[in-house]
């Protein structure tokens, strides 16, 4: 029994296997193939402390396509909202379900859930990591760039957030060059140190830069909202600090015509990205969103096999 709290815990070949399974699931889905449910009658619990569109619905769809039922719940709907401990809650859920996908404010909550669980715990987003998003990002880049290894991608904006961190981690596992483009006060140099062993094995490279011109020649330009959930009190300061890092048509021109545009969504149009980019010919955000479903199927299949 394994968990998916962060891709840091996975070896490069394991990440690649999950992505190959994702591509296979997608190929069969697009071909209209109706395949025998892998886990008929099983239950997956979606425990969400935060709102969600793509993560909640992609996990629900993925579970259904594998023959499982997903039940969505929040702290206010469980006794955990009235003081029952996480440990006791997880011991009970372990008797009913085969997995719990949890979206939480603090990554430590996920760790406590996993420590007290006899079923798989999946990170559906925490303040530090978003591994499900990173897997969908990798599948999308693979599809459009035509290769899985050696990809060059620039994440522009809040380079300290969970999406940027998980992109860097999966990039290190797959031998990518990940350019984290944002203000110096958001640089997390410890992340590069933590990934040094994987980078040495795969030949990847991760570096921080505050120059928007460093998007030149990449395969993909990626951004995310400037004010993530939980940082609303810092909204104005973050907008001021990140305004020079808006992904607009000029940035895409620097990147080059072959570069694709990625965004994990939801987008705050007019802030981190302009309409002409997200709706433009280089944007692949809707395919990227669909890929959340296919990679979720692969994660379920990999963990529950």
UniProtKB/Swiss-Prot annotation:
Locate the residues binding L-ornithine.
162, 224, 228-229
Ribonucleoprotein among the record's keywords?
A: no
In alphabetical order, the GO MF annotations are:
amino acid binding; ornithine carbamoyltransferase activity
Please give the start and end residues of each transmembrane region. none
Record localization: Cytoplasm
Organism of derivation: Pyrobaculum islandicum (strain DSM 4184 / JCM 9189 / GEO3)
Residues in the signal sequence: none
As for what it does, the entry says:
Reversibly catalyzes the transfer of the carbamoyl group from carbamoyl phosphate (CP) to the N(epsilon) atom of ornithine (ORN) to produce L-citrulline.
Among the record's GO biological process terms, what is one?
citrulline biosynthetic process
Pfam families (alphabetical): OTCace (PF00185), OTCace_N (PF02729)
The family database entries (NCBIfam families) matched by this protein are listed as:
orni_carb_tr (TIGR00658), PRK00779.1 (NF001986)
Task: Give a yes or no for keyword Isomerase in this entry.
Answer: no
Name the HAMAP family on file: OTCase
What is the protein name given in its UniProt record?
A: Ornithine carbamoyltransferase
């Amino acid at each position: 029994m394994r968990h998916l709290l962060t891709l840091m815990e996975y070896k490069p070949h394991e990440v690649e296997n999950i992505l190959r399974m994702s591509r296979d699931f997608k190929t069969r889905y697009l071909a209209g193939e109706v395949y025998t449910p892998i886990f008929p009658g099983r239950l997956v619990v979606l425990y969400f402390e935060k709102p969600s569109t793509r993560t909640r619905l992609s996990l629900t769809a993925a579970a259904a396509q594998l023959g499982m039922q997903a039940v969505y719940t929040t702290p206010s709907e469980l006794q955990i909202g009235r003081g029952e401990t996480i440990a006791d809650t997880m011991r009970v859920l372990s008797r009913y379900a085969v997995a719990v996908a949890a979206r939480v404010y603090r990554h430590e909550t996920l760790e406590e859930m996993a420590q007290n669980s006899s079923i798989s715990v999946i990170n559906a987003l925490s303040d530090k990591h978003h591994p499900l998003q990173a897997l969908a990002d990798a599948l999308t880049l693979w599809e459009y760039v035509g290769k899985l290894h050696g990809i060059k991608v620039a994440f522009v904006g809040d380079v300290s957030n969970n999406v940027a961190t998980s992109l860097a981690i999966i990039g290190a596992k797959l031998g990518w060059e990940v350019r984290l483009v944002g203000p110096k006060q958001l640089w997390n140099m410890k992340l590069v140190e933590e990934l040094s062993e994987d980078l040495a094995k795969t030949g990847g490279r991760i570096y921080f830069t505050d120059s928007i011109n460093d998007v030149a020649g990449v395969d993909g330009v990626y951004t995310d909202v400037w004010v993530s959930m939980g940082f609303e009190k810092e909204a104005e300061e973050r907008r001021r600090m990140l305004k020079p890092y808006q992904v607009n048509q000029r940035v895409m021109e620097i990147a080059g015509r072959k570069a694709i545009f990625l965004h994990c969504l939801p987008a705050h149009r007019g802030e981190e990205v302009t309409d002409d980019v997200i709706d433009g010919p280089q944007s692949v955000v809707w395919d990227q969103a669909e890929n959340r479903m296919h990679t979720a199927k692969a994660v379920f299949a990999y963990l529950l096999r």
